[in-house]
């Protein structure tokens, strides 16, 4: 059994501060194979991500995936890396800073399920600052066991090590939150006003294996519900938008339709002008900037497409920060 973590030199009456912790997936520390490998290892050894027996999965992971994938992934990260660091880390930090500015009576931090800043390190910092109440917000509007579930797992792992445990609240999902929907609507309308509008809007969400859905993961249904609400807010007809799922890997069957498949099919169906937005990603990252903005464009044009626009994620959009503040205030309740 692991020992309890040391408690800070604070009396119990001093451990009464409230904090908001924004949680995102994670990123390697640098766009190099050496940095990507430990990140992938921590990610792909989580039972929330790969639901296979260790005896079956670990030989594949260590013998193939961690041998060949880091170099390929590092090359992809190089294409989208900012001077300040990983886009996901940069934008998530900006969201936390904006939230802190709007809620100055609280401590606001961000942490990653995998990589840095780690949930363990940030919770230790908050404990030392006298935080006794924590609102953890996984930055995934649609709940999936492999995203929101994994993030909350990491928080709970640290609670198991605390002798004097924090009080913790989490927000498991907000796929139908009015502020979130309104922020996306305004963001897309502004983009269209500035850059023009295609014939169809693709709403691309991260995929999950079909088996996860069959076993009770509500994620695909929540994605489709979000898409419906957003389409209604934008006053789109059913012919003017489509919903798809991206980022599949491995040989298992994933939920459909596949974003990558549609890049090849839509031009052949007469859709040669396409806009793509990813409602489930609240910060631009590898899956949006490289997979959709760069590779998706190539796939669409190779299939005969003529005009392709990637609409960036909400990132630190002021409307999204407004929605995030409202979401936090609603769930903090009497803690403020």
From Swiss-Prot:
PROSITE patterns: FERROCHELATASE (PS00534). Its EC number is 4.98.1.1. GO terms for biological process: heme biosynthetic process. Keywords: Cytoplasm, Heme biosynthesis, Iron, Lyase, Metal-binding, Porphyrin biosynthesis. InterPro entries: Ferrochelatase, Ferrochelatase_AS, Ferrochelatase_C, Ferrochelatase_N. GO terms for molecular function: ferrochelatase activity; metal ion binding. GO terms for cellular component: cytoplasm. The keyword Nucleus does not apply. Fe cation binds at residues 206, 287. Pathway: Porphyrin-containing compound metabolism; protoheme biosynthesis; protoheme from protoporphyrin-IX: step 1/1. Belongs to the ferrochelatase family. This is Ferrochelatase. It comes from Neisseria gonorrhoeae (strain ATCC 700825 / FA 1090).
